[in-house]
Amino acid sequence: MSERTFNWKNKDIRAQVDVVDSKLLPTLLLRNALVLNPYVKQWLKKNIWIYQDRIVYVGHELPNRAEEIHTIDCEGKYIVPGYIEPHAHPFQIYNPQTLAEYVSQYGTTTFVNDNLFLLLQSGKKKALTILNELKKQPVQYFWWSRYDLQTEVLNEDHVLPFDVRKQWIEHPDVIQGGEMTGWPRLVDGDDLMLHCMQATKKQRKRIEGHFPGASDKTLTKMKLFGADCDHEAMTGDEVMRRLELGYYVSLRNSSIRPDVRKILQELHEKGFRYYDHFFYTTDGATPNFYKGGMTNELIRIALEEGVPAIDAYNMASFNIAKYYQMDDYLGVVGPGRLASLNILEDPLNPNPVTVLSKGTILRENGCDLKAFTKTDWHKGGLVPLELSYDMTMDDLQFSMPMGVKMRNAVIMEPYMIEIDNSMEQLSFDHDESYLTMLDRHGKWRVNTMIKGFASSVQGFVSSFTTTGDIVAIGKNKADMLLAFARMKEIGGGIVLAENGNILHEIPLALCGCASSEAYEDVLEKEQKLRDLLTERGYEFCDPIYTLLFLQSTHLPYIRITPRGIFDVMKKTVLFPSIMR
């Protein structure tokens, strides 16, 4: 990479060397641990000297005056590098701080994050302010730079002009480009996207793909364009196809694609047991998926499926750091590396008893030390949503002949509307509901029907969508208006109304798309929302992703976008949005 922000200054390095020479005392000593060494693939009994945020010595010696140093006795315990999530979407109604604060207790302390939310919600100048704010936290955040907005908007050149893309690509905290949700545009001749990819490569940074179901020929083309890794393999065969073409592969286990166990079983059935080009990712799962942690759960699955322990842990740390050319800084418990590591009671149990990140103890002997601080989101323009308009009955006029039918939680296909949808209350005898999408600025709307969402949801409104525009779904127009009014009143969020009452709400104070509340509170509210929707006929796995992907044109077949109802396969607007 062209520039790195985590280099220590000369005086810091001199002080670290002085610690090795016993001229200064370490700030933390870990004694008698069995340390995972990924270079020799062995557990080695060592003492670890840490000075502030850096590991300065790993070996058999103890420092002078060791009794004066804060010491953790690791006799009989194992030390592994802090876990890395290489593909995070950190605003899935939670936010990067609260997510990290929660999952770091389970050992994940480095996050490579999507910047799409910041591009759409924070503005060109303020978005990078958030990166600096998050550096104050005791975990490590890196980012990727989007080449497209993952939906059809009216002004993409304004939201994502080349100068903004270039600014992100060249930022030292940005370590990759992608993910390539807009790759069909690239194949069709989008030279601006190719130019951005070339700019990424000139910075010696990686490019993340997004190639679900891609053929060998498509994968080959993407390699020629510059893609390095893909997280969309869903079977053992798809993993092998990518490996054979020279890709690194992120094995995904997310709330909508929990594939890791199945993939490992299929690879092992083929006799394939070579893991050096594999990572894990949870690909931005929704809150309840992380109830028991993040990367630790994927390591557990790998261990249960017979992956050797050292390989299972390398896939969570060393392999990722090496891929991003950061193994001199992360992913190794060794001299010169950042002091981010996990202390385990047993290598077969990836839940750490003690967690260090950037030299700070986040968890000790099973206790959360509350090391995080509040992030000032206002500096980055992430404030409560202020709508300048109200939804009215005029916004709930439905005459379109075609609606969207849910095949699963995220795949939508067209269907012809046959019921009478001119009334204010629809019957509970079918699973068709009104669907309206409103511009957050009040300029346009899209009205259609959605089939398969639920049979008895009366009024459901969310400002959590890909673009932050407002979606309203329901059987009863009055309850839809009530839910909208409450969503507006609380500054954005997800609201469920029924029979003139508010049943449930999730306030989303960060532009109406992410919560500022503690992760545990968000998790509890999301679970209650799932339960209420399930009771009313929602049959799929993840309503949060249903809301997010209604607009997302990287998935087939039909999407509700700011431009109107969009045919993804034909790349055309079937029914344009209507000016209000």
From Swiss-Prot:
The protein's Enzyme Commission number: 3.5.4.2
EC class name: hydrolase
Keyword ATP-binding: no
Catalytic activity, reaction form: adenine + H2O + H(+) = hypoxanthine + NH4(+)
Keyword tRNA processing: no
Keywords: Hydrolase, Phosphoprotein
Record SUPFAM superfamilies: Composite domain of metallo-dependent hydrolases, Metallo-dependent hydrolases
GO terms classed as biological process: adenine catabolic process
Sites bearing Phosphoserine, chain numbering: 399
GO MF annotation: an example: adenine deaminase activity
Pfam family membership, one: Amidohydro_1
Family designation: Belongs to the metallo-dependent hydrolases superfamily. Adenine deaminase family.
Name of the protein this chain belongs to: Putative adenine deaminase YerA
Species for this entry: Bacillus subtilis (strain 168)
